[in-house]
Amino acid sequence: MTKRASQTGNSREKLHCSFCGKAQDEVRRLVAGPGVYICDECISLCNEIIAEEPQSGEKTAIVGDIPKPTEIKKILDQYVIGQEQAKKALAVAVYNHYKRIFHNERKAGDVELEKSNIMLIGPTGSGKTLLAQTLARILKVPFAIVDATALTEAGYVGEDVENIILKLIQNADNDVKRAEMGIIYIDEIDKISRKSDSASITRDVSGEGVQQALLKIIEGTVANVPPQGGRKHPHQEYIPVETKNILFICGGAFVGLTDIIKQRVGVKSIGFHSNEVVNDRGRKIEEGESLVHHVIPDDLMKFGLIPEFIGRLPIIATLDELTIESLKSIFTEPKNSLLKQYQKMFDIENVKLKFTESAIEAIAQTAIKRESGARGLRAIVEEIMMELMFQIPSRKDVLEVVVTDDTVLKKEAPITILKGDIEKIA
């Protein structure tokens, strides 16, 4: 017994940490693994190294290299046709937002720059979401889109406002530090306007209540985000997220807003039998010019947004309603235009795809009639191309497909040019 005990004791004395080489009696604890040992000191050192690693990568790709407003707009031009005023406003706002972050982090001077979130106002399909998505891609920051109509204030059926932060964390591969520098686009923000421009004693859980709930998050606070989403409850753990550096872009169509603006600017008579709409500064609003470009915070208050909420979104960028010409350009010109995407899909099958000018005109006219904007273009083209895309992969005799206006307007089949036809001509 004694001999075995002493042998065991001797064997224990020979145990050493596989990493630092210290003996068992030189450290407080030695943890054994399959053929290896690690002491408590090495474990502590490993924890410190792991804790330091996220800090080295917590800055986004834009640190020290924020694209200038002119550079941002130039890239936006590749993806979004028209909307010059909105692109310039967004380029300046985004540049100033990230410049502010780095200024405040360096604590340069006594002046702390305040956060400026953005309100995008424009018709359905005018490019609001695409602008926000493209900005996030330019800046290489996490991006999340949420629908304001799904949100309700705490205590009611629906999503808590903190869940919008969770989507950003998920899109940042669960890297909270990266998410804290991201962009959140809240769509259909006009749908959470209160039902009248006067305060009500009745509960408006999807309107004014949601605006109140969003205030702190948009302004900047430490939000406690439930890791699994859904409603909060007292016994779950939360992810603390600092929102002061998250850029919030809120977008909406604001149907009826132009009527409010028109009531404010009024119609003034100039000379005999002539009426001209002028803005508050007396400048004539030209025929065809959208009244939405003359929106002021008071108009949004009358629409149903509360003053505190409007104050958190000081930058207002407005988008024009799309015309037939702009829809034609959107279909053909951008870097990843719908035309180029479909041509690429057919090219993979070794088939050329062509749309005649009259076909493109007809597609744009159809989108205008449906009031679906740019996003309606894909649905129209899908209807036209569905049967062809079903057949083409199985056919090896098709050389080229030509879509005409009759294909769009009369639902006739596109013209197909077969390889045999070319051989006969030759």
Curated annotation (Swiss-Prot):
Which SUPFAM superfamilies does its entry note? Glucocorticoid receptor-like (DNA-binding domain), P-loop containing nucleoside triphosphate hydrolases
Gene Ontology biological-process annotations? cell division; proteolysis involved in protein catabolic process
Q: Where does ATP bind?
A: P123, T124, G125, S126, G127, K128, T129, L130
Q: Which SMART domains match?
A: AAA, ClpB_D2-small, zf-C4_ClpX
Specify the ClpX-type ZB domain's residue ranges.
5-58
Q: Which InterPro entries match?
A: AAA+_ATPase, ATP-dep_Clp_protease_ClpX, ATPase_AAA_core, Clp_ATPase_C, Clp_protease_ATP-bd_su_ClpX, ClpX_bact, P-loop_NTPase, Znf_CppX_C4
GO terms for molecular function, please?
ATP binding; ATP hydrolysis activity; ATP-dependent protein folding chaperone; protein dimerization activity; unfolded protein binding; zinc ion binding
Residues at which Zn(2+) binds: C17, C20, C39, C42
Write down the CDD domains for this protein, in alphabetical order. RecA-like_ClpX
| Gene Ontology cellular component list | HslUV protease complex
**Highest taxon of the source?**
Bacteria
Listed A to Z, the keywords are: ATP-binding, Chaperone, Metal-binding, Nucleotide-binding, Zinc
| ATP-binding keyword on record | yes
Under the heading HAMAP family, the entry gives:
ClpX
Q: What does this protein do?
A: ATP-dependent specificity component of the Clp protease. It directs the protease to specific substrates. Can perform chaperone functions in the absence of ClpP.
Q: How does it assemble?
A: Component of the ClpX-ClpP complex. Forms a hexameric ring that, in the presence of ATP, binds to fourteen ClpP subunits assembled into a disk-like structure with a central cavity, resembling the structure of eukaryotic proteasomes.
Q: Which family does it belong to?
A: Belongs to the ClpX chaperone family.
Name assigned to this protein: ATP-dependent Clp protease ATP-binding subunit ClpX
Organism of origin:
Leptospira biflexa serovar Patoc (strain Patoc 1 / ATCC 23582 / Paris)
Gene name tied to this protein: clpX
